[in-house]
UniProtKB/Swiss-Prot annotation:
A motif (SIFI-degron) lies at residues 2-19. In response to mitochondrial stress, the precursor protein is ubiquitinated by the SIFI complex in the cytoplasm before mitochondrial import, leading to its degradation. Within the SIFI complex, UBR4 initiates ubiquitin chain that are further elongated or branched by KCMF1. It is found in: Mitochondrion inner membrane. Residues 26-36 are mitochondrial matrix. Component of the cytochrome c oxidase, the last enzyme in the mitochondrial electron transport chain which drives oxidative phosphorylation. The respiratory chain contains 3 multisubunit complexes succinate dehydrogenase (complex II, CII), ubiquinol-cytochrome c oxidoreductase (cytochrome b-c1 complex, complex III, CIII) and cytochrome c oxidase (complex IV, CIV), that cooperate to transfer electrons derived from NADH and succinate to molecular oxygen, creating an electrochemical gradient over the inner membrane that drives transmembrane transport and the ATP synthase. It comes from Carlito syrichta (Philippine tarsier). Pathway: Energy metabolism; oxidative phosphorylation. The chain crosses the membrane at residues 37-60. Residues 1-25 form a transit peptide. Residues 61-69 are mitochondrial intermembrane. GO terms for biological process: mitochondrial electron transport, cytochrome c to oxygen. Component of the cytochrome c oxidase (complex IV, CIV), a multisubunit enzyme composed of 14 subunits. The complex is composed of a catalytic core of 3 subunits MT-CO1, MT-CO2 and MT-CO3, encoded in the mitochondrial DNA, and 11 supernumerary subunits COX4I, COX5A, COX5B, COX6A, COX6B, COX6C, COX7A, COX7B, COX7C, COX8 and NDUFA4, which are encoded in the nuclear genome. Coiled coil: none annotated. This is Cytochrome c oxidase subunit 8A, mitochondrial.
């Protein structure tokens, strides 16, 4: 690395610090209807079945994937 590299990096970082950072104005309304216990249970169960179950099956059968037959 050159001797000038730290000076260049410091110069770039200094000018980047002065730039304004745009902030998102996110506002949310209250929900139209509250979720019930059954709705939450169905949502969590479907997430488990769709994402975690296939991943668990693949991980449990990883040794059979490694073997070449």
């Amino acid at each position: 690395m050159s001797v000038l590299t730290p000076l260049l990096l410091r110069g770039l970082a200094g000018s980047a610090r002065r730039l304004p950072v745009p902030r998102a104005q996110i506002h949310s309304k209250p929900p139209r209807e509250q979720l019930g216990t059954m709705d939450v249970a169905i949502g969590i169960t479907s997430c488990f079945l769709c994402f975690l179950l296939p991943a668990g099956w693949v991980l449990s059968h990883l040794e059979s994937y490694k073997k070449r037959e």
